[in-house]
Amino acid sequence: MNINSTLFLQAVVFAILVWFTMKFVWPPITKALDERAQKIADGLAAADKAKSELSSANKRVEAELATSRTETATRLADADRRGQGIIEDAKARAVEEANKIIAAAQAEAAQQSVKAREALREQVALLAVKGAEQILRKEVNAGVHADLLSRLKTEL
């Protein structure tokens, strides 16, 4: 074989190889590469979508946290106000009860003072009668002199 025919024959074989490769080998390879590229693009799109969903979920969570914080602060303030009101009511009731107890004690003390004065008046009247009896050296009849004794009690 001659170099020219060999070269021509090799060029024909090479052309057949290129045609065979382009017809039967190249399409499955390009199809596989295209599918792989599509999967990668879908994965990146899903990652971007998940990232945006995560961002929006984080924003919703932050909004909910802010809402719950303000609600908690409001409830704590309400509870504190109610607690202060209950304490003030209890103090007012305690002061009122103390005033009632003091008034009752003062009334009882005044009543006992009146009773003690009456008892002392009667004792003084008896002592005065006994003293007068001893001075006069004779017995004074309480029934006969009841008017005199009652006037003496009122004067004392």
Swiss-Prot record:
Keywords: ATP synthesis, Cell inner membrane, Cell membrane, CF(0), Hydrogen ion transport, Ion transport, Membrane, Transmembrane, Transmembrane helix, Transport. It is a single-pass membrane protein. The keyword ATP-binding does not apply. SUPFAM superfamilies: F1F0 ATP synthase subunit B, membrane domain. CDD domains: ATP-synt_Fo_b. GO terms for molecular function: proton-transporting ATP synthase activity, rotational mechanism; proton-transporting ATPase activity, rotational mechanism. Its main location: membrane. One of its GO terms (cellular component) is plasma membrane. The chain crosses the membrane at residues 7-27. It is found in: Cell inner membrane. The keyword Amino-acid biosynthesis does not apply. F(1)F(0) ATP synthase produces ATP from ADP in the presence of a proton or sodium gradient. F-type ATPases consist of two structural domains, F(1) containing the extramembraneous catalytic core and F(0) containing the membrane proton channel, linked together by a central stalk and a peripheral stalk. During catalysis, ATP synthesis in the catalytic domain of F(1) is coupled via a rotary mechanism of the central stalk subunits to proton translocation. Component of the F(0) channel, it forms part of the peripheral stalk, linking F(1) to F(0). This is ATP synthase subunit b. The lineage of its organism: Bacteria, Pseudomonadati, Pseudomonadota, Betaproteobacteria, Burkholderiales. The gene is atpF.
